[in-house]
């Protein structure tokens, strides 16, 4: 199947350290070589800053504008070649795009051909915000009735599930719901889809990161006091204390632990966890 990587933070942070190890699994240290993708939510004032992997610098900006536009911008990269060899993936490994919510995916095709339109993460608009979704699993006999504007472009079970999730969210809420209200609805939708097969997924609208576990999904919270971390898939390590301050908090979610010396917490099958500002809130 596939592998997932997500990041949720309380301040814009780059994911170059984590993505470097993750991308090696896309055809080098593992066999997920059928495409990859990554999406970064950004506020109006964010951009690319000079820095080291997973640094946490924030540009000066107007607070009112930031609150209004926080996380509404999106940078989205996909490629149907392997992440371990893709020049675009190499760009992401070296380009410190800062974001509070990131979703990445490396694909091992089970349904749908190897093609650009079948690469995760997928993107849709709802309530004036972008929504990003990536899935690891294999859904069988899942054929929901779709209507309205949410329809898949490619031929994967994953994008079909995403279209259904978006449709049901729109049907369930007359106005723009809160993160807590969305979490309740998403638990109901996930419980409806999960009987069709493994349904590990990451979902974000730029305000929160939702992670649903079916088989394998882990998370780690990085906060003060920060320590060293060493990647499993590359001979790379970092001292986070050199690139952070005491208020920074970062949650990383992944299919299999990326580092060998951090405490990765396994999520329970059927569990939907929501992260806001780098910590679990529900």
Describe these PLM feature segments:
Residues 80-92, 106-128, 145-148:
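Short acidic (Asp/Glu) patches
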Residues 228-271:
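A conserved acidic, glycine/proline-rich C-terminal tail/linker
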Residues 1-83, 270-272, 278-282:
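Extreme N-terminus nucleophile/cap motif
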Residues 154-157, 215-238:
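Gly/Ser/Thr-rich active-site loops/lids in small-molecule metabolic enzymes
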Residues 141-143, 147-172:
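Glycine-rich phosphate-binding loop plus the immediately following alpha-helix
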